[in-house]
């Protein structure tokens, strides 16, 4: 089953075509990676899928009428209250999503996010990796069916990135669907079931990582990235 189907999405900003003729599907249960250079329309595409901005042309259809209640989205802005602790943030976001969390449930979530030792520390004082994990935690506190993460490992060291990857894989094991964007091709190759590659506002390649590398006769996604973004002189 498809959770989201987008057809012919177009978006301009100040006469610049940011997204052009974009078609995509998000399939239930998959980990889908959206990749491509900076400025090719990935974040704009995500915003259109979420209904944050409206496309100039095209349509987006959803698997249920109340889809907004069943999506958790962590974008590139800080989604939590910086002056409150991780524990307090989980309780606050639970209330926003009308989910009443017991102390036991909050303790369990903090353990899952590896934040048990810092659960009472103000979020602003957490490390970047801890803040990223908390950001995912508060945006998924209502156990959404679809989770959208915009560059969740950006700026993180390998250990912190590894923790985020484990969280994403755990979501998939718990029957969640995940769409994430990334510039780390090793990361994408490691955890993504399917990849959508964007360039110049369009999808230029899509499929399973192993199928794409085989089709384009390259050893890995990093080499495919270089091939598809090569500038012809």
PLM feature spans:
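A short, surface-exposed alpha-helical micro-motif characterized by mixed small hydrophobic
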Residues: 188-190
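ABC ATPase "signature
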Residues: 206-207
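Conserved ABC transporter NBD signature motif
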Residues: 58-69
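Conserved ABC ATPase "signature" region
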Residues: 91, 95, 101-118
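Catalytic Walker B motif of ABC-type/P-loop ATPase nucleotide-binding domains
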Residues: 147-151
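Conserved ABC ATPase signature
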Residues: 122-126
């Amino acid at each position: 089953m498809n959770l989201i189907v987008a057809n012919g999405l177009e978006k301009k900003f100040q006469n610049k075509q940011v997204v052009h003729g974009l078609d995509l599907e998000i399939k239930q249960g998959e980990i889908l990676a959206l990749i491509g250079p900076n400025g090719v329309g990935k974040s704009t595409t995500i915003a259109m899928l979420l209904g944050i901005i409206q496309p100039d042309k095209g349509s987006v259809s959803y698997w249920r009428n109340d889809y907004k209640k069943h999506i958790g989205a962590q974008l590139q802005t800080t989604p939590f209250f910086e002056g409150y602790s991780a524990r307090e943030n989980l309780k606050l976001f639970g209330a926003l999503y009308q989910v009443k969390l017991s102390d036991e449930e909050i303790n369990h979530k903090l353990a899952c996010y590896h934040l048990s030792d810092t659960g009472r520390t103000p979020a602003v004082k957490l490390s970047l990796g801890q803040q990223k994990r908390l950001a995912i935690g508060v945006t998924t506190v209502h156990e959404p069916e679809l989770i959208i993460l915009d560059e969740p490992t950006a700026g993180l060291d390998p250990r912190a990135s590894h923790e985020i990857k484990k969280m994403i894989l755990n979501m998939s094991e718990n029957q969640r669907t995940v769409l994430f964007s990334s510039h780390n091709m090793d990361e994408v190759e490691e955890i993504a079931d399917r990849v959508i590659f964007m360039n110049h506002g369009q999808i230029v390649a899509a499929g399973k990582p192993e199928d794409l590398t085989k089709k384009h006769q390259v050893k890995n996604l990093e080499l495919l990235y270089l091939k598809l973004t090569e500038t012809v002189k």
